[in-house]
From Swiss-Prot:
The keyword Nucleotide-binding belongs to this UniProt entry's keyword annotation: yes
Domain ClpX-type ZB: 1-52
Name under which the protein is recorded: ATP-dependent Clp protease ATP-binding subunit ClpX
NCBIfam families named among the record's database cross-references: clpX, PRK05342.1
Residues that bind ATP: 113-120
GO molecular function: ATP binding; ATP hydrolysis activity; ATP-dependent protein folding chaperone; protein dimerization activity; unfolded protein binding; zinc ion binding
Binding positions for Zn(2+) per the UniProt entry: 11, 14, 33, 36
Function of the molecule: ATP-dependent specificity component of the Clp protease. It directs the protease to specific substrates. Can perform chaperone functions in the absence of ClpP.
Organism, as annotated: Anaplasma phagocytophilum (strain HZ)
Length: 415
């Protein structure tokens, strides 16, 4: 029984005195205050709430239209993803209907260079469908029993994203990046244990196909005696992404090998308007180092092309949450208007192409360009405006301090 030395009773859970709460309820061995009762009631109510159903009624065209608002370019990949996701959740909606035909999952593999939009596509899909989303890096995963993350830790991230609502988590999306980094070292089976390559692929097999996994709510190895949460992966959509550097050579070698005799003129022609990666076949990925069983569980494969200057220019200005809009909002909070010349934006896009970082490199360039302006926004403002010109971007490339010129009024754009 909770009683202080002075004889005042207190809550056995939070420790608050009788005088500090509205009501203190007595039990045989303990007291509980009204605040703790309300808190416990809220927790129980949350657990009993039905899981959010998500927007599973969207048609492929509607899904792509929303993707278009956030992801610029990659039209074919957006179409492929929209259809795959629609079919996956259509299968889920009709899971209770008895059918002679069992429809397998539409797990997806996105192949494309850094900064082409793989992660953004997966994240946007989850937002469109209003389902829990978790992201993992394949390079941190190892086989169970070795130093590193277990595959079950990915499911834990999804559970956390769903606020430990198991039903909601079982309809979520998991994106695993850098999957090309877990390719086995050679095409032949290795005698030595490959715990971060083929071993991880083997560990992922059952999870991505569909199984009931025991997930440690506190993260696994550090808490061996905790109770596990059972989660079915039958309806979790897995999306994998990777750059697959060197896959082009494998595709071209296959293409040359099959281009013999009568069919040579037909088969050896790779369309100059299409990226080589768009011709990837499962056999190419096996040669790259993914095991056949792993590839067999990912039926949908699509490639994302490298973004050119014009596309990167559009990435800067067109999406709902474009970088230009984000930085303009930050300056607006200081009662300033941020303006970019079109030539300045094209110069930023050109710099990202030169760095070979795709859309991901745009933010780093913008940060470098605007650092001094954000440090002293009023010092470079002219009549409440901060204007960025092409010359400023070019001076950044040359390592010059364009902020001083802007403050003197020498480099103001046409804003």
């Amino acid at each position: 029984m909770s009683e202080t030395k002075k004889g005042a009773y207190s809550c056995s859970f939070c420790g608050k005195l009788h005088s500090e709460v509205k009501k203190l309820i007595a039990g045989p061995e303990a007291y509980i205050c009204n605040e703790c009762v309300e808190l416990c009631g809220g927790i129980l109510q949350e657990e009993n709430l039905p899981a959010k159903q998500g927007r599973f009624d969207l048609k492929p065209r509607e899904i792509k239209e929303v993707l278009d608002e956030y992801v610029i370019g990659q039209e074919h990949s957006k179409k492929v993803l929209s259809v795959a996701v629609y079919n996956h959740y259509k299968r889920l909606r009709n899971s209770g209907v008895i059918s002679e035909v069992e429809i397998s999952k539409s797990n997806v593999l996105l192949i494309g260079p850094t900064g082409s939009g793989k992660t953004l596509l997966a994240r946007t899909l989850a937002r469109v469908l209003q389902v829990p989303f978790a992201m993992a890096d394949a390079t941190t995963l190892t086989e169970a029993g070795y130093v590193g993350e277990d595959v079950e830790n990915i499911l834990l991230k999804l559970l956390q994203a769903a606020n430990f609502n198991v039903e909601a988590a079982q309809r979520g999306i998991i994106y695993i990046d850098e999957v090309d980094k877990i390719s086995r070292k050679s095409e032949n089976a290795s005698i030595t244990r490959d715990v971060s390559g083929e071993g991880v692929q083997q560990a992922l097999l059952k999870v991505i196909e569909g199984t009931v996994s025991s997930v440690p709510p506190q993260g696994g190895r550090k808490h061996p005696h905790q109770e596990f949460i059972q989660i079915s992966t039958d309806n979790i959509l897995f999306i994998f992404g990777g750059a697959f550097d060197g896959l082009e050579k494998i595709i071209e070698a296959r293409n040359r090998g099959s281009s013999m005799g009568f069919e040579a003129n037909v088969q050896s022609m790779v369309s100059p308007t299409k990226d080589v990666l768009s011709y990837a076949e499962p056999e190419d990925l096996v040669k790259f180092g993914l095991i056949p069983e792993f590839i067999g569980r990912i039926p949908v494969i699509t490639s994302l092309g490298k973004l050119d200057e014009n596309t990167l220019f559009r990435v800067l200005v067109e999406p709902k949450n474009s970088l230009v809009k984000q930085y303009a909002k930050l300056f607006e909070m200081d009662n300033l208007e941020l303006k970019f010349d079109d030539d300045a934006l094209m110069a930023i896009a050109r710099k990202a192409v030169d760095r070979n970082t795709g859309a991901r490199g745009l933010r780093a360039i913008m940060e470098s360009l605007l650092l001094d302006f954000m440090f002293d926004p009023q010092g470079c403002a002219h009549e409440g405006k901060v204007s960025i010109s092409k010359e400023m971007v070019e001076n950044l490339v040359l390592g010059k301090n364009c902020f001083e010129d802007a403050r003197k009024g020498n480099l103001y754009g046409r804003g």
